[in-house]
Structures are given as C-alpha cells and as structure tokens.
C-alpha cells in the first residue's frame, strides 16, 4: 500500500495478513490517496478529500414506490453535502422533515450514540419531525397509509439548500 498526501508520497508498506498499516503524518487539508498493489501491480486506488462547508441536503432511497397497505416502510438516507456533492463529516445541523400526502413519518435516526432525543413522533399521524444530523448523515422512515398517493418528503436546515424526494404509494 502506498499513501500520498497532497501529492507528496509518504511511502509504501507491505500489508501483513489480517493486519493494518499506519503512517506518521501531520493533518493538513487536501487530498489523501491510498494505492494498493499486488505482485507489483496497482489493483486499487482510494481517494479522500477535505470537504468544503455544508451546502445542501440530499435524500436517497432504494425504493421509489411502496405498498399502500398501512404497514410498508421506506428508509430514506439523508446526506449533508458540500457544493461538490461530498458528505461533510463534521456537519450536524438540525434537520426538519416535512411530509405531504397520505403517509406518515414513522421514525428517525442519526447514528449518534450520545443522542438522547426522541427517535419517533408521539402521535400516529406525524407529518413533521426534527433531528440533528450526525457526521453528515441521518435517516427517516416513511410509512404508507391505505390510500395510494405520491408522498412528498422535504428536509430543511438553516443555511442549507432544501432536500426533497417523492415516494409513490401503490395498492397491493
């Protein structure tokens, strides 16, 4: 494995079986490139860059449609990104989720082991809920009703571009 920081090579080390590697380096903003070799040939390259300030909220899901049966749930991943679309790992803004349509916000999460706030609404017909992001990430669970519709989820935070996502609910 070879490590390069801002164009300066810090050296190449052999990976011990089931082990790890470490280099002595002083933190500086920029780009770190790790290049893996096997039998002298490059087999992988991974790059990590320092991000710019948080700029926008991006919401993603692997399911664009859920069943309108009152039970089906869509997991939405929320990312706080910089202007280049990179997750900002130190961004922890308060996110407010708003849902329009025949569904509800079932719960939220942020992965912060020290977060003691509520992770689900007190009422069963919740259409707005807030939680801080943690390390640039959060999740929100959206549950269908029995009525097919298009659910519109938005997320806002101070000084960030709003994120939005449409989820279709369909009869079984």
Task: Label the predicted regions.
Residues 18, 68-71:
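Solvent-exposed, conformationally flexible loop/turn segments
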Residues 22-27, 124-146:
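Short, hydrophobic beta-strand segments
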Residues 40-52, 161-171:
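Edge beta-strands of extracellular beta-sandwich domains
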Residues 4-8, 44-47, 73, 84-121:
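Short flexible loop/turn segments that cap and initiate beta-strands
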Residues 51-69:
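Low-complexity, acidic Ser/Thr/Pro/Gly-rich terminal tails and inter-domain linkers that flank the onset
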Residues 29-30, 146-152:
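Short tyrosine-centred short linear motifs in exposed loops/low-complexity segments
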Residues 1-45, 61-62, 80-84:
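Long hydrophobic segments that form regular secondary structure
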Residues 35, 71-89, 95, 151-155:
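Beta-strand-rich structural segments
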């Amino acid at each position: 494995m070879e490590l390069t920081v801002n164009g300066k090579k810090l050296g190449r080390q052999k990976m011990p079986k089931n082990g790890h590697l470490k280099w002595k380096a002083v933190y500086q903003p920029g780009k770190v490139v790790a290049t893996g070799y096997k039998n002298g040939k490059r087999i992988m390259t991974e790059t990590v860059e320092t991000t710019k300030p948080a700029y926008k909220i991006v919401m993603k899901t692997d399911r664009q449609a859920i069943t309108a049966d009152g039970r089906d749930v869509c997991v939405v991943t929320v990312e706080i990104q910089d202007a280049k679309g990179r997750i900002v790992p130190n961004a922890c803004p308060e996110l407010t989720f708003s849902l329009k349509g025949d569904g509800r916000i079932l719960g939220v999460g942020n992965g912060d082991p020290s977060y003691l706030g509520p992770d689900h609404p007190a009422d069963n017909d919740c259409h707005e809920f807030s939680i801080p992001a943690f390390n640039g990430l959060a999740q929100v669970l959206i549950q269908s009703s029995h009525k097919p519709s298009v659910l519109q989820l938005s997320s806002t935070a101070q000084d960030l571009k709003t994120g939005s996502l449409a989820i279709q609910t369909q009869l079984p």
